[in-house]
C-alpha cells in the first residue's frame, strides 16, 4: 500500500494511524477560526509549521488532551481522513464529497509536502491538508492532494497555479472533490489508495506489455521506473532544427499521446537552442514517444529523445544513510573466486563433499551407457545399487529413506543432508508425485528393500528406459529439469519447478566438480561493478525485465557486498538478452558489466 507524505499535527507522530494524521484535534466539529483570530495569528506561522495552523489556545489544549488520550490507548471514533471527510458527520456515517480539495500532478520528485503547503498558502490561501503520494518504497510519485479552508480557494488555485512552473516542471491542478483523480493516478502507477479506502486497486509493479519490456529503444532504467510508478511524463528532445517551434513539437509528438505542454528552450535573445521538452498526460505515453521518435528525422535532423532528468528519480539505489561500503583502502578491485560465479570457497563449504560421499567428483556420473534399470542406478553416483546408499553420509542407508522421505519425499533435503544450505526447496514430493503409485509407496515406506522391482514397475510410465541419458545430468542439481528432458514425458516438466536447489547448494568442490562435469546451458549471468548497497532483491527486480528470474545473488564477504552477483533465468534466451541490453548501463552511477556465467 502506497504511503504518503502528509500534514501532521505537531507532536502527533506517535498517534494511532501510521498513514494519516488529523489536521485538527480529533473530534473537534469545525476547523474555521474567527476571521479576526486567524488574522491575528497569521504572522506567527512560519514555513516550518506542520501544515496546520493552531487557531487558538483552546484548540491547542484540546489537542494535548486528545494526544494524552491516545497515549493511554483510547481512540477517537471520528478521525479526520481527506477522502471521506464530513465535518458534521459522526462515526460510521457516510461521508460526502469535499469540494475544497484539488489534485496536483507533475510535482518534482524531490519536493516535500511542506514546500507545497507553503507555496499554496502564499499563492492561493489557507491550506488545511497536504498529502504527497509515495510508492511502496517510500519514494514520491510526483502527485498529491491539497485541501483549502474554503471552496473559493479551489477556483483561485485553478486560475493561478495550474501550469505554474515549479523547479522547471509545470504543475497540473484539477478539482478532486471525490478523490477520483487521485484514484486514477494511483491505478495508473499500480499503487493503492492512501488509507486503504479504495479496495481492489492492486499493488506492486505495473504490468507492462512485451512491446515495452522487450523494446531495445527503451532504456532498462526507464522501464523499471515506469513499472514502479516513479516515472514522470516529460521527455527531453535534442538536435531539433532551429525553425521548430513549440507548436510543431506538439503536433509531432501528439502522435504518441496526449500532449499537455510543449516547450522550446531559448537563449537570452529568445532564439531556439535546438532542444525542448514535451509533457504528456501519462508516463507511458512519454515512454511510447521515446520508442517512436528517438532517432527519427525532423526537417532532416535526427531527434534525440529521452526522459527528462526531472522525470526520473535520481540515486535510486542509494542507501538510506547515504553511506556506501567501500573496498579496503588501497585495494583497486577484486577478481573471481574459485566457486560458482566467482564466489570464494569458504572452509565450511569445503566439507560439503564429505556429506555427499561419492557424489561429488563424479557428479551424478552415470558412468555406464545409461541407468540400465533402476537397480543399477548407482554407478558413478555412489549409490552402489540402492542397497549401497550407505556411502552417502547424509542418507545413512536406504533402510532409513522411508523415514527420511515420509510422505513421498515431501520433507526438504535440508534435514536429510544435515545442512541448511544444501537443501532442495520443496523436496522430491512434488517432483515424483506423478511418477506412479508404486513409486510413491516405495519411497514412502519400502525403498529400503534390496531390490527396486516394485518401484521400477511403478515408474515405468514416467522414467521408462533411461538408456538414452548419457553424459551426465544436463545442468546439474540446480536445474534438474533440463537433465530429465529425455527421461520420459512425465518427469521433465515436474522437476523443472520442484528440484531447484537453494542458494549455495553447489558451491564448494562438489558443486564445482558437478558443474564442470555436466556443463551448463547458459541460463546464468555474472554481473560486475554493482553498487555496494545493492541488494539481491533490487538485482532481481532490475533484471526481471529481461525474463523470468529464477535466482539472484549478491556475492558477500564478511557480511559486505563484493560488488558482483549472479542472476539465473529460466532460459538461455533470457540470459543472452540480459547480456545484450543490460551490459554497460549505469546503476547509481556505476557502469555494470554483464556476461554469461561460464562457471555456472
From Swiss-Prot:
<feature type="compositionally biased region" description="Basic and acidic residues">
    <location>
        <begin position="83"/>
        <end position="96"/>
    </location>
</feature>
<keyword id="KW-0539">Nucleus</keyword>
<keyword id="KW-1017">Isopeptide bond</keyword>
<keyword id="KW-0804">Transcription</keyword>
<dbReference type="Pfam" id="PF00076">
    <property type="entry name" value="RRM_1"/>
</dbReference>
<dbReference type="InterPro" id="IPR000504">
    <property type="entry name" value="RRM_dom"/>
</dbReference>
<feature type="cross-link" description="Glycyl lysine isopeptide (Lys-Gly) (interchain with G-Cter in SUMO2)">
    <location>
        <position position="53"/>
    </location>
</feature>
<feature type="modified residue" description="Phosphothreonine">
    <location>
        <position position="13"/>
    </location>
</feature>
<protein>
    <recommendedName>
        <fullName>Myelin expression factor 2</fullName>
    </recommendedName>
</protein>
<keyword id="KW-0678">Repressor</keyword>
<dbReference type="InterPro" id="IPR034630">
    <property type="entry name" value="MYEF2_RRM1"/>
</dbReference>
<dbReference type="GO" id="GO:0003723">
    <property type="term" value="F:RNA binding"/>
</dbReference>
<comment type="subunit">
    <text>Monomer.</text>
</comment>
<dbReference type="GO" id="GO:0005634">
    <property type="term" value="C:nucleus"/>
</dbReference>
<keyword id="KW-0694">RNA-binding</keyword>
<feature type="modified residue" description="Phosphoserine">
    <location>
        <position position="431"/>
    </location>
</feature>
<feature type="domain" description="RRM 1">
    <location>
        <begin position="100"/>
        <end position="178"/>
    </location>
</feature>
<feature type="compositionally biased region" description="Basic and acidic residues">
    <location>
        <begin position="27"/>
        <end position="42"/>
    </location>
</feature>
<dbReference type="InterPro" id="IPR012677">
    <property type="entry name" value="Nucleotide-bd_a/b_plait_sf"/>
</dbReference>
<keyword id="KW-0832">Ubl conjugation</keyword>
<feature type="compositionally biased region" description="Basic and acidic residues">
    <location>
        <begin position="54"/>
        <end position="72"/>
    </location>
</feature>
<dbReference type="GO" id="GO:0030182">
    <property type="term" value="P:neuron differentiation"/>
</dbReference>
<feature type="modified residue" description="Phosphoserine">
    <location>
        <position position="17"/>
    </location>
</feature>
<dbReference type="InterPro" id="IPR035979">
    <property type="entry name" value="RBD_domain_sf"/>
</dbReference>
<keyword id="KW-0488">Methylation</keyword>
<keyword id="KW-0238">DNA-binding</keyword>
<feature type="region of interest" description="Disordered">
    <location>
        <begin position="1"/>
        <end position="101"/>
    </location>
</feature>
<dbReference type="GO" id="GO:0014902">
    <property type="term" value="P:myotube differentiation"/>
</dbReference>
<dbReference type="GO" id="GO:0003677">
    <property type="term" value="F:DNA binding"/>
</dbReference>
<feature type="domain" description="RRM 3">
    <location>
        <begin position="523"/>
        <end position="599"/>
    </location>
</feature>
<comment type="function">
    <text>Transcriptional repressor of the myelin basic protein gene (MBP). Binds to the proximal MB1 element 5'-TTGTCC-3' of the MBP promoter. Its binding to MB1 and function are inhibited by PURA.</text>
</comment>
<feature type="domain" description="RRM 2">
    <location>
        <begin position="233"/>
        <end position="310"/>
    </location>
</feature>
<keyword id="KW-0677">Repeat</keyword>
<dbReference type="InterPro" id="IPR050374">
    <property type="entry name" value="RRT5_SRSF_SR"/>
</dbReference>
<feature type="modified residue" description="Omega-N-methylarginine">
    <location>
        <position position="406"/>
    </location>
</feature>
<dbReference type="InterPro" id="IPR034631">
    <property type="entry name" value="MYEF2_RRM3"/>
</dbReference>
<dbReference type="GO" id="GO:0003729">
    <property type="term" value="F:mRNA binding"/>
</dbReference>
<keyword id="KW-0597">Phosphoprotein</keyword>
Amino acid at each position: 500500500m502506497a504511503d504518503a507524505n502528509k500534514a501532521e499535527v505537531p507532536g502527533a507522530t506517535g498517534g494511532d494511524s501510521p498513514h494519516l494524521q488529523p489536521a485538527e484535534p480529533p473530534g473537534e466539529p469545525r476547523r474555521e477560526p474567527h476571521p479576526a483570530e486567524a488574522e491575528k495569528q497569521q504572522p506567527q506561522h512560519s514555513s516550518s509549521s506542520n501544515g496546520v495552523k493552531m487557531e487558538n489556545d483552546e484548540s491547542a489544549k484540546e489537542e494535548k488532551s486528545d494526544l494524552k488520550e491516545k497515549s493511554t490507548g483510547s481512540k477517537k471514533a471520528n478521525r479526520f481522513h481527506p477522502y471521506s471527510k464530513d465535518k458534521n458527520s459522526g462515526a460510521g456515517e457516510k461521508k460526502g464529497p469535499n469540494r475544497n480539495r484539488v489534485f496536483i500532478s507533475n510535482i518534482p520528485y524531490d519536493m516535500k509536502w511542506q514546500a507545497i503547503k507553503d507555496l499554496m498558502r502564499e499563492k492561493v490561501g489557507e491550506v488545511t491538508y497536504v498529502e504527497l503520494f509515495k510508492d511502496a518504497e517510500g519514494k514520491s510519485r510526483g502527485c498529491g492532494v491539497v485541501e483549502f479552508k474554503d471552496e473559493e480557494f479551489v477556483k483561485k488555485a485553478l486560475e493561478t497555479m495550474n501550469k505554474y512552473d515549479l523547479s522547471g516542471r509545470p504543475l497540473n491542478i484539477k478539482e478532486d472533490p471525490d478523490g477520483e483523480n487521485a484514484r486514477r493516478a494511483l491505478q495508473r502507477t499500480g499503487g493503492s489508495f492512501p488509507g486503504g479506502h479504495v479496495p481492489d486497486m492492486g499493488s506492486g509493479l505495473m504490468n507492462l506489455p512485451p512491446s515495452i519490456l522487450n523494446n531495445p529503444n527503451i532504456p532498462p532504467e526507464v522501464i523499471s521506473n515506469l513499472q514502479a510508478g516513479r516515472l514522470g511524463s516529460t521527455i527531453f528532445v535534442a538536435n531539433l532544427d532551429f525553425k521548430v517551434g513549440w507548436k510543431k513539437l506538439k503536433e509531432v509528438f501528439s502522435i504518441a499521446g496526449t500532449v499537455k505542454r510543449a516547450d522550446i528552450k531559448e537563449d537570452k535573445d529568445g532564439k531556439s537552442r535546438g532542444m525542448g521538452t514535451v509533457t504528456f498526460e501519462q508516463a507511458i505515453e512519454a515512454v511510447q514517444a521515446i520508442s517512436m521518435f528517438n532517432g527519427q528525422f525532423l526537417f532532416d535532423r535526427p531527434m534525440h529523445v529521452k526522459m527528462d532528468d526531472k522525470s526520473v528519480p535520481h540515486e535510486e539505489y542509494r542507501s538510506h544513510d547515504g553511506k556506501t561500503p567501500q573496498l579496503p583502502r588501497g585495494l583497486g578491485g577484486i577478481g573471481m573466486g574459485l566457486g560458482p560465479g566467482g564466489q570464494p570457497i569458504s572452509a565450511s563449504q569445503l566439507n560439503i563433499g564429505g556429506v555427499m560421499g561419492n557424489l561429488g567428483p563424479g557428479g551424478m556420473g552415470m558412468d555406464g551407457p545409461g541407468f540400465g534399470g533402476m537397480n543399477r542406478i548407482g554407478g558413478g553416483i555412489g549409490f552402489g545399487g540402492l542397497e549401497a546408499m550407505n556411502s552417502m553420509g547424509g542418507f545413512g542407508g536406504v533402510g532409513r529413506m522411508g523415514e527420511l522421505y515420509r510422505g513421498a519425499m515431501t520433507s526438504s533435503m535440508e534435514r536429510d543432508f544435515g545442512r541448511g544450505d544444501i537443501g532442495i526447496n520443496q523436496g522430491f514430493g512434488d517432483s515424483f508425485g506423478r511418477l506412479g503409485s508404486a513409486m510413491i509407496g516405495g519411497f514412502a515406506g519400502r525403498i529400503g528393500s534390496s531390490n527396486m522391482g516394485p518401484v521400477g514397475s511403478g515408474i515405468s510410465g514416467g522414467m521408462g528406459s533411461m538408456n538414452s541419458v548419457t553424459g551426465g545430468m544436463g545442468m546439474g542439481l540446480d536445474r534438474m529439469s533440463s537433465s530429465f528432458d529425455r527421461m520420459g514425458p512425465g518427469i521433465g516438466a515436474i522437476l523443472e519447478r520442484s528440484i531447484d536447489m537453494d542458494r549455495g547448494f553447489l558451491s564448494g568442490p562438489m558443486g564445482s566438480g558437478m558443474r564442470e562435469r555436466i556443463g551448463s546451458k547458459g541460463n546464468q549471468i555474472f554481473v560486475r561493478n554493482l553498487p555496494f548497497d545493492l541488494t539481491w532483491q533490487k538485482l532481481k527486480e532490475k533484471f526481471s525485465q529481461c525474463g523470468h528470474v529464477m535466482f539472484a545473488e549478491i556475492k558477500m564477504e564478511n557480511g559486505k557486498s563484493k560488488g558482483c552477483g549472479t542472476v539465473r533465468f529460466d532460459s538461455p534466451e533470457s540470459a543472452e538478452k540480459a547480456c545484450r541490453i543490460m551490459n554497460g548501463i549505469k546503476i547509481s552511477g556505476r557502469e555494470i558489466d554483464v556476461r554469461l556465467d561460464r562457471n555456472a
